[in-house]
């Protein structure tokens, strides 16, 4: 069953008298429960695509359809790159933010918040403000907030880019654990091929500006995965080198312009 | 001290009014009011120049603000009113003196008198009507307050039966009248005439009814000016009195000078409309320079009773007419 | 740039000693007439005067009256300033409408506004509060608008993404997000309120610290005038500290 | 939050129309005596007065004199403020020494400082400039110190790592790094300089815009007073723009 | 020949009444021309060690000796993590900063600056201010500045941490190219094992707080290296997994505390 359907989508920005063609002719179907990673050179329009799905930006042409199965659930929730955690709300209030905005019953909000605080291991820090948290903890808050909102799809824009490699891996494991439980449809942007290999069912590779989907690779490795397994698997190394090469050539193309 | 200066003077009396050898500069503090007529006329008609005196005006918000400047020797001469602060500063060792008249009311056409709000002019017609009214006065424990007090005494109304409103500026009284915040005000020319023309207020009887000899403003001299620069001071006073006499000729004796004095006045004060000068109640200025000494002492007693005076002072040193007398010796006494 | 334990009390020592040093210098200069003591009475004399005035009782009345005017006038300026500032920050048409008006009125000195205030608001307590309110209004309105405008775009996106309605957006994002810059403006407004009290108490006042200052100056009772100045200075310091404390309470997340 | 091409002229339209709207309202209210025209003369009347005053010639003299006082007074306040502010920002002992002094003197209203200024500096041009200088000093000094203190530590480390000597450190790091915040303070100082001109021209002035305002008010020549207010407002706006332009030149890296 | 010699170094910070033991008993020798990578969990004291070498911090006990071979050259120059580029100086002025601080002749400064601008490909952007540069370009400026100063040793504190993976690789290649030319002694901090494998002759692994050197691995792969080669080499994969495991256990140890 297709959850997200994108057809002939394109997006142009007007900057003074100049047009910037950010996305061009994107056609794409994502199935219910799929974890999809979007890879591409910087400035190719990944964020733009996600923002269109999140209804924060309007497409210039084409259609985006998200299949709603439960009218009571919100369509989508987004995990932002960094700083997405609101600094004047405590950890608890941040996690409860989406639920509060939907004006759900207090008990329900409390119970959900509690549950996801537990999940990301922040119960002890519920009363702290974001300034007192490390980068990794902040992203945990962001993830908990999105999951607590229980949306139909989850959109994540490089949530771990600002973390160091070791912390990144811990959070990846945690994300996978929560995801495995809920089996939400996830669209995840990253620059890291290793991250994509570890997390996704499917990797979409975008071209340099204007962004088009130029490669669609299914990752069939068994779950649960780990860095060790990914690294030791020769099949995975092959996929890595393959994507690497293609990405490198796209990046170089951008630099020549 | 005055005897000392007399000696000084005698030594030079061979040619008392020759111009100074070197140009002397005299700084006069003013607040831009009409009572500075003597200064303005003497300057513009060249009386100061005749004695080789160069005068410069420095304008202040009101006479109290001039005192530190006089005391600090920043200005030589100032126009001031008698007020508690003046006496206090003398008690503090600031040796400023009253040296000549700079304003009293002319009978029946006072330049400093009460006005009544336009819409109340038919209700408040006589002194007893002021009972229960709001009356604006521009200073506390100064000549305004004294005249206010004299008026109430004359009206047989106690201070508790009216509301005293302190208002720092005569302009503010106009605004407060327009806004019906006050009923009466102790106002000054040319705002009295201006307010009458703009239907803001009307004259309320006349201050000479109850304070005929009120000494409203005086010329103040700095101690340095009076002692160390005596030869300049004498010439300055002579020139000043000549200016005052021209003023007196025009406004009191109605001698026509082709509008020269009026144009000087219009030039130096805020009343630019020369025709209005024929309407206003002009400041009374004694062409012989003398002040109402008894009234000044009465005012002093009044402030003292109000508890506004700190310390005792010797009244004789405050009023110093020696300069006027010296000048009169030379230029002669003005005959009415 | 290195911090050692034993030096940590030195800064405090300097902080305390500098005003004391100044006072001592003044005292000596005044006692030995290096400064004209008629105009600069010695601090000890001012202190004696302060005590005398406090004992006679009506000093506290002056303080009470001025503080009432300052606090109410401050509130009277701050509340509309915050409302208009928030509107300006949130809606660009408001911003475009109000900013030229603010630009025009801001440079007009309070002293020059007095006649107009008097005409419009009379000579009662209200006109004094309005004087303070007007002078407080501008910095607070400007800072509030800047505060809203400077909220990081990402929080607006978060709010939108989680479907915050207008009310929630206002109370959960716009208001708390603009608070830090707004409080800077309020801190400035507080300073200005104190600076304005003398001007405000020039219209028909018969009491208050500002009245104390300029009346005593007019009466040439300089020690009393200095008492007034010291009071203003003290309350300036006190309010600053108070607002700083308030700020820390209000912005636990900063 | 969406921007379309055709709406881009609307904000400008609003910005221009709001003062015009206000003027029109005033004109009508004044013409039909909804506002007392004796106290609120119609804008057209004020304009006529302005033209008359300009033709008679001495309006420009008033402007010239006030601008000279404002600019020199401003410079007189800003230069020491920057020096002390930089020292306070760079050396903590300076900071600890000066900050209580600044805290004490800042809340004292300019109006209340006038007598002291008069005694210390007389009644000449210099005392007027000093009045302005004092009021300008505080915000600039405080902002300069804050500017230095807020320079990101990493630039200090970079300077140290590359062995910058004291002079280079000052000119390459401390000064340019504190400039943005310092300029905010200067912008504030400029606003305050204009606000202070009326007070400054109350001591022994015979000309200037401030003098024009309060002399004409004393004489109850309100249209002339409003001309003065309009001039102040105009110069406030003008100086703001000037400083903003200057800022853009001085901070190409912002 | 040993270039850097660290003996029995330890560093304690005082924070209110608490002592933080950042480094403990570090003894270490780095040879002339060696490229050494320092790896370790977050907060283990890597930056502190570098700052001590850079003379920005004093050691509590122990000695640090940097062997000076040329009296005219500065001892060390540092490349900071991010924001190390001074925003009010242009690209050119930033690169010339170290030379200018040493008050060298204008011609010399100009020539050196020109040379390194060319090297990092920023000649065209010399007059721009840092705000107009991308993250990668800023780090190029930072590297050019350090090399232009021609120090005895180079200290780099996670210079590429904030870059995306593709840009990171491009800069790594550029760094290697410049380094190969000059053969400076480099001490390089990173969180990325891949980065360490690609760049270094030797990897030092630090323990969690208090920081000690717990592993010292020589990387003997031939140069020039590339990601592809590193990834395809089974020996390298072995080293990766080895270090990964050890690092992971150190990180977990930190989390338990
Ligand atoms: N609001 C906007 N106005 C104008 N141009 C924009 C806007 N948002 C994005 N762009 C442009 O659209 C292009 C795609 O931007 P986008 O942020 O989607 O890239 P990205 O793939 O997310 O890059 P990165 O990997 O660096 O995050 C870029 O050239 C960018 O400059
Ligand atoms: N100036 C300081 N004052 C007090 N403690 C400090 C100071 N600098 C560092 N520390 C402490 O010393 C320890 C080591 O810090 P350091 O910055 O060297 O770690 P790091 O290995 O660079 O970490 P990261 O990988 O996160 O950059 C940390 O616990 C830190 O809190
Ligand atoms: Mg992006
Ligand atoms: Mg570090």
Identify the residue ranges that each predicted region occupies.
Chain A
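Catalytic Walker B motif of ABC-type/P-loop ATPase nucleotide-binding domains
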Residues: 154-157
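Short helical segment in ABC ATPase nucleotide-binding domains corresponding to the A-loop/adjacent helical element
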Residues: 92-100, 110, 114, 218
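Helix-to-loop junction immediately C-terminal to a conserved catalytic motif
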Residues: 54
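Conserved signature/switch motifs of ABC ATPase nucleotide-binding domains
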Residues: 128-131, 149
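Conserved ABC transporter NBD signature motif
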Residues: 62-72
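The feature captures the beta-strand-to-loop junction immediately N-terminal to the Walker
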Residues: 39-41
């Amino acid at each position: 069953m297709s959850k997200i359907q994108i057809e002939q989508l394109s997006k142009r920005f007007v900057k003074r008298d100049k047009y910037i063609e950010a996305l061009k002719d994107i056609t794409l179907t994502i199935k219910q429960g799929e974890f999809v990673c979007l890879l591409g050179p910087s400035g190719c329009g990944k964020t733009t695509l996600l923002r269109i799905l999140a209804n924060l930006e309007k497409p210039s042409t084409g259609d985006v359809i998200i299949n709603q199965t439960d009218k009571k659930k919100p369509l989508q929730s987004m995990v932002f790159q960094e700083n997405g955690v609101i600094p004047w709300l405590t950890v608890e209030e941040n996690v409860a933010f989406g639920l509060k905005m939907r004006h759900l019953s207090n008990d329900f909000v409390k119970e959900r918040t509690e549950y996801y605080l537990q999940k990301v291991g922040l119960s002890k820090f519920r009363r702290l403000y974001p300034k007192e948290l490390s980068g990794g903890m902040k992203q945990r808050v962001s993830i908990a907030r999105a999951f607590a909102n229980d949306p139909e799809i989850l959109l994540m824009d490089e949530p771990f880019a600002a973390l160091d490699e070791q912390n990144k891996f811990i959070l990846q494991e945690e994300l996978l654990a929560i995801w495995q439980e809920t089996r939400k449809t996830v669209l995840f942007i990253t620059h890291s091929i290793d991250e994509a290999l570890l997390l996704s069912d499917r990797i979409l590779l975008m071209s340099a500006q204007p962004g088009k989907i130029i490669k669609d690779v299914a990752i069939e490795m068994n779950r649960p995965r780990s860095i060790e397994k990914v690294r030791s698997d020769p099949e995975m190394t092959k996929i890595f080198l393959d994507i690497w090469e293609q990405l490198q050539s796209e990046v170089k193309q951008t630099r020549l312009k | 001290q005055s005897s000392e200066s007399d000696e000084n003077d005698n030594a030079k009396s061979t040619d008392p009014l020759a111009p100074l050898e070197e140009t002397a500069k005299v700084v006069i503090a003013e607040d831009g009011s009409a009572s500075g007529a003597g200064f303005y006329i003497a300057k513009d008609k060249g009386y100061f120049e005749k004695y080789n005196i160069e005068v410069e005006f420095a304008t202040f918000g009101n006479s109290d603000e001039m005192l530190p400047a006089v005391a600090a020797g920043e200005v030589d001469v100032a126009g001031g009113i008698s007020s508690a602060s003046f006496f206090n500063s003398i008690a503090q060792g600031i040796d400023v003196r009253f040296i000549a008249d700079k304003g009293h009311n002319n009978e029946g056409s006072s330049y400093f008198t009460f006005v009544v709000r336009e819409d109340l002019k038919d209700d408040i017609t006589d002194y007893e009507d002021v009972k229960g009214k709001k009356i604006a006065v521009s200073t506390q424990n100064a000549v305004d307050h004294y005249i206010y007090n004299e008026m109430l005494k004359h009206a047989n109304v106690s201070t508790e039966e009216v509301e005293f409103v302190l208002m720092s500026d005569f302009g503010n009284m106009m605004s407060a009248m327009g806004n019906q915040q006050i009923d009466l005000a102790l106002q000054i020319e040319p705002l009295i005439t201006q307010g009458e023309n703009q239907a803001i207020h009307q004259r309320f009887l006349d201050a000479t009814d109850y304070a005929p000899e009120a000494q409203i403003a005086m010329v103040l001299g700095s101690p340095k000016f009076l002692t160390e620069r005596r030869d300049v001071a004498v010439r300055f006073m002579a020139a000043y009195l000549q200016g005052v006499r021209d003023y007196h000729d025009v406004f009191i004796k109605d001698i026509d000078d082709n509008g020269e004095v009026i144009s000087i006045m219009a030039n130096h004060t805020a009343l630019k409309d020369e025709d209005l000068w024929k309407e206003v109640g002009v400041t009374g200025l004694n062409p012989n320079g003398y002040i109402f000494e008894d009234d000044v002492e009465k005012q002093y007693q009044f402030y003292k009773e109000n508890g506004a005076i700190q310390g005792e002072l010797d009244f004789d040193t405050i009023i110093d007419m020696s300069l006027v007398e010296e000048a009169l010796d030379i230029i002669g006494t003005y005959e009415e | 740039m290195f911090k050692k334990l034993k030096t940590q009390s030195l800064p405090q020592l300097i902080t305390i000693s500098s005003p004391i040093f100044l006072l001592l210098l003044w005292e000596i200069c005044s006692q030995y007439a290096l400064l004209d003591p008629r105009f600069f009475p010695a601090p000890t004399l001012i202190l004696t005067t302060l005590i005398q005035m406090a004992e006679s009782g009506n000093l506290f009345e002056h303080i009470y009256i001025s503080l009432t005017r300052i606090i109410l006038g401050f509130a009277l300026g701050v509340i509309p300033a915050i409302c208009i500032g928030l509107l300006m920050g949130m809606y660009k048409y408001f911003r475009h409408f109000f900013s030229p008006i603010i630009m025009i009125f801001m440079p007009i000195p309070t002293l020059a506004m007095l006649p107009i205030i008097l005409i419009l608001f009379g000579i009662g307590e209200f006109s004094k509060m309005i004087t303070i309110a007007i002078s407080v209004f501008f910095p607070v309105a400007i800072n509030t608008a800047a505060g809203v405008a400077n909220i990081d775009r990402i929080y607006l996106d978060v709010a939108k993404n989680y479907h915050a309605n207008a009310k929630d957006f206002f109370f959960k994002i716009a208001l708390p997000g603009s608070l830090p810059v707004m409080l800077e403006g309020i801190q400035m407004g507080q300073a200005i309120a104190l600076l304005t009290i003398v001007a405000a108490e020039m219209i028909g006042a018969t009491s208050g610290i500002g009245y104390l200052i300029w009346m005593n100056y007019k009466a040439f009772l300089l020690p009393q005038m200095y008492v007034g100045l010291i009071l203003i200075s003290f309350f300036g310091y006190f309010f600053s500290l108070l607002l700083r404390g308030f700020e820390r309470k209000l912005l636990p997340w900063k």
